[in-house]
């Protein structure tokens, strides 16, 4: 019998579930209730935040903490952005760990390459521990996760190259990291009375006669325009992986891949700021995740493979080191663009993300090697032979086929599970050029009153990023952007505003 633990599952039913999956999670399953509504009249505030994902909510909450009146506008009917979809961990170095700060910064520079803006990166590293404590102050239940420094070898409590345990990883005590962060931010947003206007898209950011930001023009779902007057605007709209035209223009090598991001990641904020003369950087830099669920774009995170999962092709054979940084290319170029991820019950028991997906019915299950092989329609004898060989290599702790450096599971805890995976666009690392104060830059310098945080920015993490660094950057720069925007609004309030141009 073939099932996922929730009744008989055909491949057709699994595909149907995948189609519904991303929308269900993005809609905020398990999230705190938030008072949201569309904008129905003109308004005035100190700071407008565009986007209600992790960086946007962080910016809004930080601005409110600084005493600013804030309005958040979100074009989608739900909140959470990409952050609510996060299933891994974030990075945060505790106070009193200067060596850890040095190691994290050097590793991020090594990973990001020559395009990394070190001044921007240094602020992420130095602010990472405080960002974690700040989230905890709003109820996030987070705990350390010991990981190796090598991004390709992240696992529980391994040693650094210098013999010390890395203390940089931060995970939730229960559940998934994305909902945990968004929940905490929503608690803070509610306590500060910050309104979130969903189904409200920004048409343009306006400036006064001297080029200073003075508000936004928005559209509601009925196509009606409203204006929000504000001396400061924070752009936190995410990347552009869901915009096929922008992907084709800037990252042609990833054309045809699905996006793992929120459907809201259409590059709106980049385009809005470019119309104001903003600079962009690293627009070609895109990370591809090797193991995403077809149709839904949900990811099976790196840790699943670290903890022992393997990949097989339609012949039932392994074809690569599952921890290789080139795994996505190997799946796409050498294996018809897809593969089967194989794991066992022990891994589901240990990993909240697998438990969550299992409950949603994404996995095919078999009580033996042969039964699972028949379920996924690969040659049963060859699949069994592959697993027998792999288990023997685990026993010897040596992968003589592909040189996989970690062999943590024999995959013999029945039942066994499989899920079809393929590469997908995971992060667009290019975007708006900012300075360490999160001010958006033009060729002439900072655009007065305009700030940005999160995946809408570029140069922050370079051409590649460490696992967990994206969440950390979103929170650290969200806090900076919100605080700086509030300070600018307070300064502008002391002077008489120039006449608005509306454009």
Annotate each PLM feature.
Residues 42, 59-62, 356, 430-492:
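C-terminal structured subdomain/cap of oxidoreductase catalytic cores
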Residues 91-124:
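Glycine-rich active-site loop/strand segments that organize a redox cofactor
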Residues 126-224, 243-246, 394-413:
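Conserved redox-cofactor binding core of oxidoreductases
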